[in-house]
Regions:
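Short glycine-rich loop/turn motifs that provide flexible caps or phosphate-binding loops at active sites
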Residues: 6, 24, 55-58, 78, ...
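Generic structural signal for well-ordered, non-membrane alpha-helical segments
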Residues: 10, 14, 27-31, 35, ...
Length: 233
């Protein structure tokens, strides 16, 4: 991954590596190392507070509205610092950047600008193309391959502020368990990976949601239902 992100690997090497990983299935250690490699080559947002990331993998084909961005605003208003990392729409009606631009927010802020915004308001948005410029080395090969690769799940794991708290929506039940292990490996001390039984990369209102929770290195798994929160299906 380091050679891909630094531009040292050629297209044949990139294709072979990504295809081989996809065919055999990425392990927890391989996903962790890949995410760490992306973080190593990103522009960092420096801060002296514990911040929360709330994001989904996408890929659930639900065409839902951008739940994570609206939730981020509510969470921040409740006093939890949020450093959200995101991009434009992939599988939903609108991505985080699309929503914020419609609200009049300048999304392409530098790390220095976002440090000020975070300290003053308790929330900031890190637009992926600004912070992960090294993705330019992977983008052409990903487009040519035209299949799902490890990069499809690395975005939610590559927060430039090194968030220690995270709520991660995952489109696949089995993958959610893997992703929570990766989050723990990457330094998240409090967080959850969730997957709705209907395939949403969200906490669903139509049935049960699988939850995998990290609390300072200890991982527990359980399910929740809408009824537990006074909501009907």
């Amino acid at each position: 991954m380091d050679e891909i992100m630094s531009g040292e690997a050629n297209d044949i090497q990139k294709s072979a590596y990504l295809t081989a990983l996809a065919m055999k299935g990425e392990t927890i250690d391989e996903i962790t190392a890949s995410a760490a490699g992306m973080r190593e080559h990103c522009t960092r947002l420096l801060n002296d507070m514990d911040v929360l990331e709330i994001v989904g993998t996408g890929g659930d084909r639900s065409n839902s509205f951008n739940i994570s961005t609206t939730s981020a605003l509510v969470i921040s208003a409740g006093g939890v610092p949020v450093a959200k990392h995101g991009n434009r729409s992939v599988s939903s009606r609108s991505g985080a950047a699309d929503v914020l631009e419609k609200l009049g927010v300048e999304v392409a802020l530098t790390a220095e600008q976002n440090e000020t915004v975070l300290n003053e308001t308790g929330i900031c948005f890190m637009f992926a193309p600004v912070y992960h410029s090294s993705m330019k080395y992977a983008a052409p090969v990903r487009k040519e391959l035209g299949v799902r690769t490890v990069f499809n799940i690395l975005g939610p794991l590559s927060n430039p502020a090194a968030a220690t708290m995270q709520l991660l929506g995952v489109y696949d039940k089995e993958l959610a368990g893997t992703m929570v292990e990766v989050l723990s490996n990457l330094g998240v001390t409090r967080g959850v990976a969730v997957c709705g039984e209907d395939g949403l990369d969200e906490i669903t209102l139509t049935g049960e949601t699988d939850v995998h929770e990290i609390r300072f290195g200890e991982i527990t798994s359980y399910t929740i239902t809408p009824e537990q929160f006074g909501l009907s299906r």
